[in-house]
Curated annotation (Swiss-Prot):
<protein>
    <recommendedName>
        <fullName>Phosphoglycolate phosphatase</fullName>
        <ecNumber>3.1.3.18</ecNumber>
    </recommendedName>
</protein>
<dbReference type="InterPro" id="IPR006439">
    <property type="entry name" value="HAD-SF_hydro_IA"/>
</dbReference>
<feature type="active site" description="Nucleophile">
    <location>
        <position position="13"/>
    </location>
</feature>
<dbReference type="GO" id="GO:0005975">
    <property type="term" value="P:carbohydrate metabolic process"/>
</dbReference>
<dbReference type="GO" id="GO:0005829">
    <property type="term" value="C:cytosol"/>
</dbReference>
<dbReference type="InterPro" id="IPR050155">
    <property type="entry name" value="HAD-like_hydrolase_sf"/>
</dbReference>
<keyword id="KW-0378">Hydrolase</keyword>
<dbReference type="InterPro" id="IPR036412">
    <property type="entry name" value="HAD-like_sf"/>
</dbReference>
<keyword id="KW-0479">Metal-binding</keyword>
<feature type="binding site">
    <location>
        <position position="192"/>
    </location>
    <ligand>
        <name>Mg(2+)</name>
    </ligand>
</feature>
<dbReference type="InterPro" id="IPR023198">
    <property type="entry name" value="PGP-like_dom2"/>
</dbReference>
<dbReference type="GO" id="GO:0008967">
    <property type="term" value="F:phosphoglycolate phosphatase activity"/>
</dbReference>
<comment type="subunit">
    <text>Monomer.</text>
</comment>
<dbReference type="Pfam" id="PF13419">
    <property type="entry name" value="HAD_2"/>
</dbReference>
<keyword id="KW-0460">Magnesium</keyword>
<dbReference type="InterPro" id="IPR037512">
    <property type="entry name" value="PGPase_prok"/>
</dbReference>
<feature type="binding site">
    <location>
        <position position="13"/>
    </location>
    <ligand>
        <name>Mg(2+)</name>
    </ligand>
</feature>
Amino acid sequence: MNKLQNIRGVAFDLDGTLVDSAPGLAAAVDMALYALELPVAGEERVITWIGNGADVLMERALTWASQERATLRKTMGKPPVDEDIPAEEQVRILRKLFDKYYGEVAEEGTFLFPHVADTLGALHASGLSLGLVTNKPTPFVAPLLESLDIAKYFSVVIGGDDVQNKKPHPEPLLLVASRLGMTPEQMLFVGDSRNDIQAAKAAGCPSVGLTYGYNYGEVIALSEPDVIYDSFNDLLPALGLPHSDNQEIKND
């Protein structure tokens, strides 16, 4: 807990930390797969693919769907499908479809987790500088933050297209710290996944791991963050601010 004593700013992951984006992501993935006449995956499975950016999400979806189709065809006594299109091109096509569909469903399929809005407001009001670091494609980030009414809290926002190396590489965290005008040691990073904690460690930032997000089926403790919290508003007393017990509901 000593690492939180000299904090001047806080940066956050987005998906699985501030927002439950799985409904929108899963819907877009399934619509893209369906458009290519591939099996659809469903939200429970898509959740396990979230966290490394859209291209990796497409690779995971395509790998699963291709294997699932092969299994189904074998069960029905049908021959396997000959793929004339290289795997890289299939991923590109799937990504293009995903971007189209996600643009249509992102806002209605993304919800703030409990206590996020009031906690961000309290942190911002306290004078702490706030940043956002996400592997989500950059064009989707700003509209989503605006629709959820939390864009006003962030001085710096880094999306997946704004850096050459996404998390778990330290580059995006180092960039946020630099733009916030502080050292990595002065910036707390809050996330829900192995990638988040690895990025924080590599950048030299103290880290908070949240237990409720998307972490590939792993408990966040295995990544050894400096602090682990079950609720987002536990950040407030840790940073010397009054604890908020206001319960929020998902946005409509």
